[in-house]
Amino acid sequence: MSGARRGNGVRLRKGKLIPRDDGKRIEEFVGAATTSTDSASVARMLAPPGWSEPAQRPEFDEVVIVLTGELTIVVEGRRERISAGEVGLVPRGKRVVYRNDGQGACDYWSVCAPAFRPELAHMETPKPRVQENHVTIQVAHGQGRDFARLLTTWARAYLVQLELSGVELSLSLVDDRAIRRLNRTWRKKDKATDVLSFPAGDLPKGTPGPRPLGDVVISLDTAKRQAKEYGRTLESEMARYLAHGLLHLLGHDHERPRDAKRMAALEEQLLGERGMVADSLQVDAKARRARSLM
């Protein structure tokens, strides 16, 4: 068809194949009108299932002719489906997204007037896709099921606040007997405690799926006891344990003053109030003042 002249005075020339790394093949034909009309471009496109183009607000009118399959066009938030044999028109200046929501490939033609040029398409930069976080919980306490959903909700919220994505977090809600056994086995401390953290090892690069952070184990018995002792609600007490344990999984600790202040600030960010490390720092400060008065 290259160089062929039609009776209407439009010359079409065959364009080169334009490779795309999103799996969409474009064979482009550009026609320039020899009369007083604006130049136009004609492109044949094959869009695979699941394909989507970034939003754009073009300075040209575009006519879409679907040959096979189905094309979804979202114009100013309104979705239209163009099936085989149908034609769609997108006026210039409208925000539009093209995508293929069907099961098979969509073969269609696009006619733009004036001719398509990237600088006239005003294509938006797509936002990076945020990978979903996965939170699982095991309940090994007779009364723990009432709090399982609450802990899971908090955990997801904490991960978002910490700007983490594509990670997996495991939670366990146990009694004092179980957490004492874990504390004795892994920390050589034969007593119950409030929360334990077990970081996951590093996976080989390229391993598919979410990145595991590790396990946070919370004692519901200790939470009940300490909530009553310090005048806090049980929910508040467990939220403190969860925030504390999660930060330990991420490598934070409170051994040195500078690290403790950093961890205390992060706990307060997650909880909206003072956390376990801040309380510990306050106790230490009071002890130092008491010793100085002796």
Swiss-Prot record:
Which Pfam families does the record cross-reference, listed alphabetically? Cupin_2, YbeY
Entry cofactor note text? Binds 1 zinc ion.
Highest taxon of the lineage: Bacteria
Q: What biological process terms from GO does the record include?
A: rRNA processing
Compartment(s) of residence: Cytoplasm
* Segments of this protein annotated with the region Endoribonuclease YbeY: 123-294
Enzyme class, UniProt record, top EC level: hydrolase
Q: Which cofactor names does the annotation list?
A: Zn(2+)
What keywords are assigned to this protein?
A: Cytoplasm, Endonuclease, Hydrolase, Metal-binding, Nuclease, Ribosome biogenesis, rRNA processing, Zinc
Listed GO cellular component terms? Answer: cytoplasm
Domain annotation Cupin type-2: ranges: 45-111
GO MF entries: metalloendopeptidase activity; RNA endonuclease activity; zinc ion binding
| EC number(s) reported in the record | 3.1.-.-
Q: List positions binding Zn(2+).
A: H244, H248, H254
Q: Hey, which family's this protein in?
A: Belongs to the endoribonuclease YbeY family.
Recorded hits in NCBIfam families, A to Z, give: rRNA maturation RNase YbeY
Biological role stated in the UniProt entry: Single strand-specific metallo-endoribonuclease involved in late-stage 70S ribosome quality control and in maturation of the 3' terminus of the 16S rRNA.
Protein name per Swiss-Prot or TrEMBL? Endoribonuclease YbeY
- What organism, scientifically named, is this protein from? Myxococcus xanthus (strain DK1622)
